[in-house]
Curated annotation (Swiss-Prot):
InterPro entries the record matches: Dihydro-acid_dehy_C, DihydroxyA_deHydtase, DiOHA_6PGluconate_deHydtase_CS, ILV_EDD_C, ILV_EDD_N, IlvD/EDD_N
Modified residues (N6-carboxylysine): 123
Binding site for Mg(2+): 80, 122-123, 447
Annotated function: Functions in the biosynthesis of branched-chain amino acids. Catalyzes the dehydration of (2R,3R)-2,3-dihydroxy-3-methylpentanoate (2,3-dihydroxy-3-methylvalerate) into 2-oxo-3-methylpentanoate (2-oxo-3-methylvalerate) and of (2R)-2,3-dihydroxy-3-methylbutanoate (2,3-dihydroxyisovalerate) into 2-oxo-3-methylbutanoate (2-oxoisovalerate), the penultimate precursor to L-isoleucine and L-valine, respectively.
Pathway membership: Amino-acid biosynthesis; L-isoleucine biosynthesis; L-isoleucine from 2-oxobutanoate: step 3/4; Amino-acid biosynthesis; L-valine biosynthesis; L-valine from pyruvate: step 3/4
Gene from which this protein is expressed: ilvD
Protein family membership: Belongs to the IlvD/Edd family.
Superkingdom, natural source: Bacteria
A Pfam family reported for this protein in Swiss-Prot or TrEMBL: ILVD_EDD_N
Cofactor note: Binds 1 [2Fe-2S] cluster per subunit. This cluster acts as a Lewis acid cofactor.
EC number: 4.2.1.9
Name the UniProt record assigns to this protein: Dihydroxy-acid dehydratase
Active site: 473
Amino acids binding [2Fe-2S] cluster: 121, 194
Amino acid sequence: MRSDTIKTGFEKAPHRSLLKATGSIVSNNDFKKPFIGICNSYNELIPGHSHLQELGRIAKEEVRKAGGVPFEFNTIGVCDGIAMGHIGMRYSLASRELIADSVETVAQAHCLDGLVCIPNCDKITPGMMMAALRINIPVIFVSGGPMKAGHTPSGQTVDLISVFEAVGQFSAGKIGNEELESIEESACPGCGSCSGMFTANSMNCLSEALGFALPGNGTILAIDPRRNELVREASRRIIDLVKKDIKPRDILSRNALLNAFALDFAMGGSTNTILHTLAIANEAELDFNFSELNALSAKTPYICKVSPATMAVHIEDVDRAGGVSAILHELSRIDGLLDLSTLTVTGKTLGENIADAEILDYTVIRSIDEPYSATGGLAVLFGNLAPQGAVVKTGAVAPEMMKHTGPAKIYDCQDDAIKGIMGDDVKAGDVVVIRYEGPKGGPGMPEMLSPTSAIMGRGLGESVALITDGRFSGGSRGACIGHISPEAAERGPIAALHNGDLITIDIPSRSISVNLTEETINERLAALKPFEPKIKKGYLARYAQMVTSANTGAILKNPVSCEPK
């Protein structure tokens, strides 16, 4: 066992003495058992994590019963909703790398034999996955589960996005203070990751398709007793994974990655999933190109429409309709779309995991014969405005905006854009451009939920597009094109735009362009002053110097590799 490094032999007497002092060693016999890290992300600041302390307790109890010795440790976490619209959002994506590094540090420093990872919200799940693939020891994921959707006293179904959009409605005089307060009080009724197909739930659903989590992980509610049972089962499974030495890189093959993207496209997941999955692929040393996604999307039907694409369906409804397994089982009817032979943490293949799954409500999960659209709910756009690509959640775009040409309305930061939208500076037909908000320029590639919600709340969602080198919340809806690469801070073409330039978005053709010649773009870029970093000290300053483009997953540069060739 790896842990023998810190517990076996006379020379390790000091190590054993310290381990006994933790209280986790019940008897000397424990030194013969595998040491299992319970990697928790309990945090009283995040509603999706406020209940995880109890899940950690359950995990430790079950690991010990199954023959292991549990050691719980915590990671940091950021609530994207609370961090939205201020300096905090610049730390959100950057926190993913801190989480990955911290999990790596604890697991390697203490020679743990395996990990039970308990994440839930946006950056915590991918951060832990990146670490798992980097250190490559047996790991199983079991998330905290989604939040229930809310209901106002009048019976309206609401979620967090309803509150953001209500702010826009209130500022436009469309609703009063009483209605705003009613939505605020009702939207988030308890613990769990926000209730739609936002980034947290998207990643937790993808965990099943990747093979890292048990069936049900993505959809069983946080408050459902089955969630505790899932934790128990996962905590028992880790001991078997350690005994059989089944590691993350045994599970995450290129085809497992494609399975996850197929699920993502079928559910219209958050655009952030592309960013995170590319980063995960990098840690697994899988050769995967951003441009390959359109071909997969073209053969993946969009069969499960969930909030924010529709307020009629939330994750609890997907669970009731059969969950991720039912969606994957339905997709498996398409010849060659899924690789059902990929290994999972159950010890079985993906095909075996989903063999008995069935759709229980066709109004929630549609048949592949009657999809919402024949192609997936996410797409990658290319053109002279995004030579390295941009991402759009097609499933949340109004039909009227699938093709749009309009004049650019330029803002060099999100705050200015929000003021412009709220101040009636943006008119029907415009293309709002928010730039210098990429991984380097932001820094941290902040989400644009506040401006997109303001556009929707002010009734402009079917006439205004928004493009950015930043990113979007999984809750954003409308013609929102993000991750434009190269970013403005790297002198990408988006930095050459002037107010009034005509921008054409053609989602069916997967293109985004500006009506400028290459010569004009290059002349404008050459005339720009060097980019001046916005933050010059602390973690974000270091992050901005090391982060790469969105089309590579916004991973950090590794200037020196000590890995053997």
